[in-house]
């Protein structure tokens, strides 16, 4: 059994996002490997509460490197650039802890697992004579600037600047470059990451989406026969999620049988703006505003609706898209970002990133097609079963172990 030292800043059971992603990787890898996991201490109680009950828990050894509550708040306040200074310091201390572990324990592989963003590769790569694996690596997508047309000046400047900083950093950041070239194996979270690493560093990587599926039981196909056609939208009302584009697509269908169920919320201004747009488009009666709901409510809704309508234009691999597949729900989204590696014509439909007006037309056309051809939806739903298995956490872990063994 291979012994793997994993750097996972955020790791916790029963959570989504980065903590849940790292936990699911670790808990599945532990079926095949002995893991030594260095993580921040925020979720220590949660980890230690569930670990004894896991059959593979004996293969999971946690080492905690805690930070202050103030730094934790910076971490989860997206956009707080002050966090990166403290995060780098955390990575250095983790490196020192890792060196100590390696002196007392046999380690076959060093794995930089999360956070997935490419800007912070940590320092495990500096440890000699042990193969270093980095990934899944994310954060390398370029925001499609054609979709900034209706954005405010601040949003336009932020995204254009971020695009340019991303390119500069992947090309010129010394530590990122050193980590990439020291790695025995690189894993890209999405095709955009693969292309950037190949283009700017001339290195190969393997594409494995950072999040995975949980196989579900068989679900009745009767929901696809309902006269009312429900499309489901889930997310924050922030700019990259493109809720206004979804609303305009519903209006463009000119089909009163199509209902859009919106799960999620935003600030007062975003909520008012979204509802005002629905009124201006004359589709108030076709939109149901559910607000923020517990995950179990969202999952239950996925098992009853007809299509998952995902309009985000800047994601790595969104957990909610994988949740749709887990619930046998066909997906309509852009052929971009993490979705491009997950959704194909067997389980849904994608449209190309072009410009907002073209996208509205393309989405509307596809929604009308789905509304008319319920057998197509049934087929996509049935195909989700095989896709679940391909994208399952268990399958990802086996894939990773095979790569470890070749490293």
What are these regions (language model features)?
Residues 272-293:
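Nucleotide-activated donor-binding/catalytic signature segment of Leloir-type glycosyltransferases, i.e.
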Residues 20, 229, 238-252:
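A conserved mid-protein helix/loop that constitutes part of the nucleotide-sugar donor-binding site
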Residues 313:
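Aromatic "clamp/platform" in nucleotide-sugar-dependent glycosyltransferases that forms part
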Residues 330-333:
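Short hydrophobic beta-strand element within catalytic cores of glycosyltransferases
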Residues 180, 292, 300-305:
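Short alpha-helical donor nucleotide-sugar binding micro-motif in glycosyltransferases
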Residues 234, 259-274, 291:
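Glycosyltransferase donor-sugar binding loop
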Residues 60-64, 134, 165-220:
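Donor nucleotide-sugar binding/catalytic pocket of nucleotide-sugar-dependent glycosyltransferases
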């Amino acid at each position: 059994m291979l012994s793997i030292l994993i750097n996972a800043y955020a790791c916790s059971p029963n959570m989504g996002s980065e903590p849940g992603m790292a936990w699911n990787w670790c808990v599945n890898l532990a079926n095949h490997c002995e893991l030594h996991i260095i993580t921040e201490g925020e979720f220590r109680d949660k980890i230690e509460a569930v670990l004894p009950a896991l059959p593979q828990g004996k293969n999971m050894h946690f080492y905690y490197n805690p930070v202050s509550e103030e730094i934790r708040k910076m971490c989860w306040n997206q956009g707080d650039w002050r966090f990166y200074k403290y995060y780098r310091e955390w990575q250095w201390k983790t490196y020192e802890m890792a060196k100590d572990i390696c002196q007392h324990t046999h380690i076959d592989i060093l794995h930089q697992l999360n956070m997935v963003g490419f800007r912070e590769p940590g320092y495990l790569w500096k440890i000699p004579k042990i193969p270093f694996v980095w990934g899944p690596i994310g954060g390398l997508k370029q925001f499609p600037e054609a979709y900034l047309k209706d954005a405010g000046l601040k949003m336009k400047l932020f995204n254009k600047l971020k695009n340019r900083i991303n390119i500069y950093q992947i090309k010129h950041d010394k530590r990122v470059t050193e980590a990439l070239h020291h790695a025995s194996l690189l894993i890209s979270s999405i095709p955009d990451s693969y292309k950037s690493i190949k283009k700017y560093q001339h290195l190969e990587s393997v594409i494995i989406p950072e999040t995975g599926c949980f196989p579900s039981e068989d679900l009745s196909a009767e929901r696809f026969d309902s006269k009312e056609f429900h499309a489901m939208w889930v997310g924050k009302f922030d700019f990259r999620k493109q809720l206004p584009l979804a609303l305009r697509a519903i209006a463009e269908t000119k089909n009163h049988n199509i209902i859009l169920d919106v799960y999620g919320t935003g600030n007062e201004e975003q909520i008012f703006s979204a509802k005002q747009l629905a009124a201006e488009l004359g589709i108030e009666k076709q939109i149901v505003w559910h607000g923020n709901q517990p995950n179990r409510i969202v999952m239950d809704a996925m098992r009853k609706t007809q299509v998952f309508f995902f309009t985000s234009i800047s994601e790595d691999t969104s957990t909610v898209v994988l949740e749709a597949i887990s619930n046998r729900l066909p997906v309509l989204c852009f052929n971009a970002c993490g979705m491009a590696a997950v959704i194909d014509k067997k389980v849904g439909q994608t449209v190309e990133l072009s410009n907002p007006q073209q996208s509205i037309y393309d989405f509307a056309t596809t929604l009308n097609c789905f509304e008319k051809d319920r057998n197509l939806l049934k087929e996509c739903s049935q195909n989700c079963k095989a896709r679940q298995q391909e994208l399952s956490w268990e399958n990802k872990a086996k894939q990773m172990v095979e790569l470890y063994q070749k490293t």
